[in-house]
Amino acid sequence: MNQTLRTGVWIGALCVAWTLVMGFTGWYKDPALVNAFFLVILVEVALLAVGLRKTAATQGYGRQVLTGTLMAVVAAAIIFCGSLLFTTVAFPSYFQDVRAAQEEMLRAAGKTPAEIEAAVQAAAAGQTPLANALAGVAGTLVTGLLASLVIAAFHRKR
């Protein structure tokens, strides 16, 4: 397996694994711990740095950016599938749980029932398995491109 594919698979697998940790521990329901999910960004950036370091000897800046972006594409495909499985099979009540946690956070912030209802309704449109999976893909691709632009400046053939 080439380095691009290997790194992309590792990124995707570790991000899905962390998502499952968030699910099985129930952290996604806890307002104090829900942001721990964003550790996936650090995982992606760190593994992109490792992967691009391994391809740096033979590739210039542009090729390194392309390679890093392709690593993110591979990861995004795995994350898309993992996200769909997470919200439809492993945790089918995920969106109801997220709504309940959102309501709790808004109540704790002193919002009125009308404000809470408006916020929950506004968020509801994006709370579907497909929308959630596509958001994961978009986040992975954007992070991959931006991180690759920076990492390639330091790890490339000169």
Give short role names for the model-derived ranges.
Residues L14-M22, E44, A75-I79, S83, ...:
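Alpha-helical transmembrane segments of multipass membrane proteins
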Residues P129-R158:
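Transmembrane alpha-helical segments in integral membrane proteins
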Residues N2, R6-W10, L66-A75:
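Alpha-helical transmembrane segments of multi-pass membrane proteins
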Residues F24-K29, L85-A90, F154:
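Helix-loop junctions at the membrane-solvent interface of multi-pass transporters
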Residues G82-A109:
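Functional transmembrane-helix hotspots
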Residues E104-T128:
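Short membrane-interface loop/juxtamembrane segments of multi-pass integral membrane proteins
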Residues L52-Q64:
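Membrane-helix interface/capping segments
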Residues M1-L52:
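Transmembrane alpha-helical insertion/packing segments
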